[in-house]
């Protein structure tokens, strides 16, 4: 998708704000069903980030796999939980929540510092894939595999971390019976 500069920037700002709002919804909403729907918004926004870079197959695959299967499974699992027991034992703030918030905030800021200090263009897997594809000796499936393991390595790692955190949160909520 070849968009003009301002439209491309507006599209990325829209997706980024959707990611931030969805992430805040996952964490801050007390109703687990609404939290699961916010996770769906986050996964949709992450998959739509692949469209400006002309990787429509990756975007469609992420929509089908993560939103279409995983998030629906999480929504059904959350709906089968007994909601009244969850809300009876809900405490506003505990010491463990404060310690967890402090640890997560420090990890977040260390990740932000690491991401900002890293020279992403000097990493070998971002420049090597173009040399391989220029040979024209490989099929489309091999090109997708090369792009997934080189250019789109970071987005897939990020989505796997988000999915892992969501599943751990769903298990933690289910165990609070």
Swiss-Prot record:
**The reaction(s) this protein catalyses:** a plastoquinone + NADH + (n+1) H(+)(in) = a plastoquinol + NAD(+) + n H(+)(out); a plastoquinone + NADPH + (n+1) H(+)(in) = a plastoquinol + NADP(+) + n H(+)(out)
A GO MF annotation of the entry reads: quinone binding
Entry-linked PANTHER family: NAD(P)H-QUINONE OXIDOREDUCTASE SUBUNIT 6, CHLOROPLASTIC
From what organism does this protein derive? Illicium oligandrum
Complexes and interactors: NDH is composed of at least 16 different subunits, 5 of which are encoded in the nucleus.
UniProt name for this protein: NAD(P)H-quinone oxidoreductase subunit 6, chloroplastic
Against Gene3D superfamilies, the record matches this protein to: NADH-ubiquinone/plastoquinone oxidoreductase chain 6, subunit NuoJ (1.20.120.1200)
Superkingdom as given in the UniProt entry: Eukaryota
